[in-house]
Amino acid sequence: MGRAVATPEDLKPRLRGVFHQWAFFAALVAIGVLVGIAGTGTARAAAIVYGIALAAMFGASALYHRINWSERPRRWMRRLDHSAIFLMIAGTYTPFCLLVISEPLALIVLAVVWGGAFAAGVINFAWIDAPKWATAVVGIALGWISVIALPQIPVTEAALLAVGGILYTAGALAYALKRPNPFPRVFGYHEVFHVLVVAAAAIQFAAVAVAVSAG
């Protein structure tokens, strides 16, 4: 197993990974909140799946970005970080497929997003040096599959999901284009991406909470 090694502080912005580190601990609390407000056994199961995906995304990102890994483990951590993004997308769909969307559409969406997340993860591990735009495009495409199910989702939850999706998309574009890059030594384009992801996740968490509490 590789070990973390020290590298010059100016190789990455000082806030790299900080926001996702905080978000990871918030996600642990969020799991408990969702399980506590779940109205049924199915809702609790959906809350757990979503909560694990949420914590996994922020946890993998924090581990990857906060530690100065040596080259070999860094490449593996990058794989894990990117794969956790696709896991989060599938995890976010799960409560709505189990609790809100009617069959057979719910089963179709569930199969597509989990199948897509698995396939994207496999490709990610096989193509570690994929350009940033490729990861962004796959994430955006997988995330916006929900538009086919929006008519079945109540207005409040649908609006929250849409706003979160827009923020995720804006973050993916910032990541792919490497801009805006306001303060490269402290808060660069990647931090813009991370902040937008945290904001998007918080908004979509509210949508999941509504669905779980009513489920």
Residues covered by each model-derived region:
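Multi-pass alpha-helical transmembrane bundles in non-GPCR membrane proteins
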Residues: 1-215
